Amino acid sequence: MFPTGDSAGREGTVNNMPAGFRLQFLQSRLKKRSVSTGSANRTPKFCQASGNPLLPPYLCGRKFLSMISRRNIRVKVMQTLYAQSSLDSATPLSNSVAHLQKHYEQTRQLLVFLLWTLTEIGRQVEKHALQKASKHLPTEADLQINTKLAGNEILWEIQQDTTLADHLKKDQGARHGMENLIKEIHAHLLESPTYQQYIAQPSRTRSEEKKMLLQILNDQMIEFEPYVEWVEDHFTNWEDDAEAILQLLTQYLQKPGKLSGQKEGVSFQQLIPADKWNFGKELLTTVIEKNEHLLSLIVPKLKNWDPERIASLDMILMKMGLAELLYFETIPPKVTLNEYIDLAKEYSTAQSGQFVNGILDNIHKELAEAGQLKKIEFRKS
């Protein structure tokens, strides 16, 4: 995460939370869409509704039309503008766009890392069995370690994805020093009743192979605190991108081996398609190029507030919201206002949502009355 501040300029980071709280915070965000089974204390491990029974509960009912939403893009633009605000104001526009591209690149790197973790857990199953069998005096149990997961056909297809292999060659930083953590995840997996049931079945079905990998993803990876801490330490975008990444990863496991974007496959372009990239770039460049005009509309509404003492994120969000109201004619004003109120509540201070809402709503009403908002009538498709 990036720093946040209040009106007095005090700043901190979400990563300063205790590790256990960070884990609970992330899980509450990811699982807020869990499917109800009619009982307050029963939550299915996978969706039972028609369409895709293999999805984890927090993804039930979601459509995989676009992995990254405009909200995700707004967050990345916000982060880019925040980073720029702490640098020389004369930062070239091209540098800001390149910085935004780095945020997109982090999203891709996170997806690659999660896929790599899955394959490494499979490899650890085989390594563990070989180590046991290679003991000087192996026991009968040492010689009969079940390696079914190592032969999981989905894992094999992932490892044969040449596009993924190319990305793995470029993204090696977060993987250094992971050996012990992979062993911990593997040890945790061995104690799982679901895993014991999986290896007890001598036969294989593609459905069960997929289901086992999704169980590992949910129960042994994103719910394992040491792993989440590792991801947080190496990927500052984890909390912002986790849900979208897990959507794409879940979809990829339905048709593995096609991250190159082949027909009916899953591509990295689906994660951040061209229209989302263009939206982010246009929003970023508009806020930078129209900065003085945006400030001329915002500052008079601050009344008793000193612009220098307003939380920097609040000012950034107000400029972004106003830029959307003025220059993005296909986005309904209500959508813009609601989005930036939510972002202010989540990323800035406790009072920021109300503050940003008051300023933007005031400006919106004046612009609408003056006929300065050029919006295309919004129609639901």
What are these regions (language model features)?
Residues 13, 34, 50-60:
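Intrinsically disordered, low-complexity proline-rich regions
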Residues 6-12, 30:
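Compositionally biased, low-complexity intrinsically disordered regions
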Residues 16-17, 32, 38:
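Alpha-helix boundary/capping motif
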Residues 2, 14-19:
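Low-complexity, glycine/proline/serine-enriched flexible coil segments
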Residues 8, 21-24, 42:
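Short linear/disordered segments characteristic of secreted peptide precursors
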Residues 25-28, 33, 46, 64:
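Cationic, low-complexity basic patches in intrinsically disordered or flexible, solvent-exposed regions
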